[in-house]
Amino acid sequence: MLRCWGPHWGWVPWAPTPWLLLSLLVCTVPFGLLGEETRQVSMEVISGWPNPQNLLHIRAVGSNSTLHYVWSSLGPPAVVLVATNTTQSVLNVNWSLLLSPDPAGALMVLPKNSIQFSSALVFTRLLEFDSTNVSEGTQPPGKPYPPYSLAKFSWNNVTNSLDLATLSAIFRGHPVDDPTGAFANGSLTFKVQAFSRSGRPAQPPRLLHTADVCQVEVALVGASPRGNHSLFGLEVATLGQGPDCPSVNEQDSIDDEYAPAVFQLNRLLWGSSPSGFMQWRPVAFSQEQRARESALACQASALHPTLAYPLPHSPIVQAFFGSQNNFCAFNLTFGAPTGPGYWDQHYLCWSMLLGIGFPPVDSFSPLVLGIMAVALGAPGLMFLGGGLFLLLRHKQYSEYQSIN
């Protein structure tokens, strides 16, 4: 079980010594001076047949490699990610086969022998729990309501939201069958954004990104909860690389400038680096302004095989990988029974990175480097000054000659 901490739960499990801080300071500075890697990034909606279909292709070309991210809302929202060792690899789509009951082989990246890594991620269900009279930290975080299957959502035409200036597009959906009218004025959105160089978004949690990743921002806005203290979550499924599920680990930090009071970074790894990864700050927000006061605690369950129950069918995953069934799934839940929550403004937003290669690593921010320099430099200067004073004083005494 991974615990995700909001502002009231931020903590550092160890107290760094001055020598550790000094070594980190020395080791961090050179990496901050390295140049930024860039890629030529294109984003296009691939025209469907006979009607427009939501198939978004991100192609990021580097000096000797190409990354492909293929997003689709055919079935549940899903992405196929592929890395090749050539700058000439292309995506091939067989629409008649893709829209058939058996779409295996409809999606290919060519040449096939250039593929170095491939996997997929599927957002299968929107979860809702009644957290009334539930103590904090309980799992599950309340009585579950029937989940919303994202395969049974109706999605907008993503072409209308395509923004080539920011390399972003938005999938916006609501249930096809909504007898209670919970989504009459609400929607679930997946904003996908690619990057041609390293940087950080302007809004929290300000995840550090490189040209090897795309960012996904999931937002639930305006939907009516089925209880007064509903907590929401997402079920996420991925392909396992062999018999075992991918690993998830936590990284702790002493720097929280970009995500105040959040000292943790979570990663899902599809294998030993460099391979594929999913990376996120363990924090969501209940207000659009995303201030610290609206930060939500969250939890991520351990990954588990899904052989015991069927997952919603994703046509693009089956189109690329065939009939593989070694899926693993985990749940992300946002909020706690007390404190801020979705009930504040009927708003919930969470961000993550999806990438191939080495996950971006936060170096210390200039503010923290400055504080460390002052904290460690001042005692050093005092020590050096004291040593010089004693040396000069000793020299004066050694040069004194008695008049006798």
UniProtKB/Swiss-Prot annotation:
Family: Belongs to the GLMP family.
Subunit organization: Interacts (via lumenal domain) with lysosomal protein MFSD1; the interaction starts while both proteins are still in the endoplasmic reticulum and is required for stabilization of MFSD1 in lysosomes but has no direct effect on its targeting to lysosomes or transporter activity.
PTM section of the record: Highly N-glycosylated. N-glycosylation is essential for GLMP stability and for MFSD1 lysosomal localization.
Protein name in UniProt: Glycosylated lysosomal membrane protein
Organism: Rattus norvegicus
Record's signal peptide: 1-35
Glycosylation: residue positions: 64, 133, 157, 185, 228
Membrane topology type: Single-pass type I membrane protein
Cytoplasmic side: 392-404
Transmembrane stretches, start-end: 371-391
Cell compartments where the protein resides: Lysosome membrane
Lumenal side: 36-370
